[in-house]
Amino acid sequence: MEIKRETSTSVSDPSPSKSKNKNSKGKALKRGLNIEGYQIEGISIAGHETCVIIPTLNLAFDIGKCPQRAVSQQFLFISHGHMDHIGGLPMYVATRGLYRMTPPTIFVPKAVKESVEKIFEAHRAMDQSELKHTLIALDVGEEICLRKDLKVRAFKTYHVIPSQGYIVYSIKHKLKQEYIGLPAEEIKKLKSSCVEITNTVTTPEIAFTGDTMSDFILDNDNIDALRARILIVESTYVEETVTAENAREYGHTHLSEIVKHADRLENKAILLIHFSARYQLDVIQEAISALPPPLAGRVFALTEGF
């Protein structure tokens, strides 16, 4: 895998169940949600565990307590080093080894790589097993190609310890306008003559923030996260018994801040995660149902566990 560098980065309050939102863009499934054509599963309860799984892309964001469904994913992206986001890492690797699956590839912020290596050293000593995996430090602005049609880039987030989010891009090669309509045989000849007949189109599909203050929305380097098809963003607090200022003290985001910056969010769908455990499911649902335009109808909640 090639890492590219670009010039262009918990103190968690401990709370997600299946969303009742049902429309053509976000349907509640028996397991997880289907949003904008992507199946999204997992659990995210602030201070307890966060793991968001995209099965069709064979990847997961953060590993929490290592829910069983996450074990099937080949690629794992860790946003930061707080226990509710990284605690299940050794179990994830060990379980894949138990099932004789391909050793996983794990991406972590550069600042925590050495600590993660020490975690595995300790578990190898205790468990007397290899815990095979590939560990890659991915810094803000760096990107990794997972396959020919898929790449991931790290972007800066704003938490109380080093943190970062990730953007998943689709890569497509589209025939240039001047060659559209040509016979297949002529297209074949052009290709064999090394003529560049396609344009590469890179599209941000999914952005995952992990834990962060709303400052990431105002960071001009994060524009792709704000125009990704789906933005998976923390919203630890959703009502006014805890203020936005309180949320910032813990390095988190309040739903009111997402409303405040709604005009900057070009995403087709927004999936809220990482709700405080203080909330009952109906409180979360009521907060989302009360959202004003332009958020109404395109915001969903990962509420497994509430």
Predicted regions span which residues?
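Active-site-proximal loop/helix segment associated with metal-binding centers of metalloenzymes
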Residues: I45, R147-L226, I230-S235, E240
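Binuclear metal-ion centers of metallo-dependent hydrolases, dominated by the metallo-beta-lactamase
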Residues: E130, T134-E142, F216-F306
